[in-house]
Amino acid sequence: MNFKLSLVYTALFAGISVSALAETRHKANTETIEQINVQDTGIKQNGYQTTGTSVVSKAEVPVFDTPNTVNILSTKLLEDRKPESLIDALYNVSGVSQANTLGGMFDAIQKRGFGRNRDNSIMRNGLQAGPAKNFSATTETVEVLKGPASVLYGIQDPGGVELISLLKNHNKRHVMSLVEP
């Protein structure tokens, strides 16, 4: 009986000593690294509600602190509604209606009663878009800046400006091949 107990005690102490040795070796190999804080200042989307900073005001100002009227259509909203044109996307934005599109050839939007079919108030990624269909499957968000603050983008009607942000291209090339045995 004493032999069995001594055998159990020996195995127990051997196991404890091996784990203690492994723990001391692990502590010797660890390094302390400096903490890095990452802060996101872009548009934060929580479903249909967007918070964060808006691109349309050309400043890193939170949407709630912007003294202008800014409406942002989030990616989630555009995915769920699946609009076919810019006027379909802007259907629920107040003060925005369709202008003369010359039979649906291009986008034309009236903002607060101002605007016509060629008023250059539609921007794609911050640049004036031509008289064409500007809404496509690559549209990520649509922002509407209403009122006289639209002069931030040049000579504009005081009704406002629409900024269409396209999906970001990360310059990754994808190669697909088919190999048959």
Curated annotation (Swiss-Prot):
Residues 62-167 form the TBDR plug domain. Pfam families: Plug (PF07715). GO terms for cellular component: cell outer membrane. Its main location: membrane. Residues 180-181 form the TBDR beta-barrel domain. Keywords: Cell outer membrane, Membrane, Transmembrane, Transmembrane beta strand, Transport. Belongs to the TonB-dependent receptor family. This is Uncharacterized protein HI_1466.
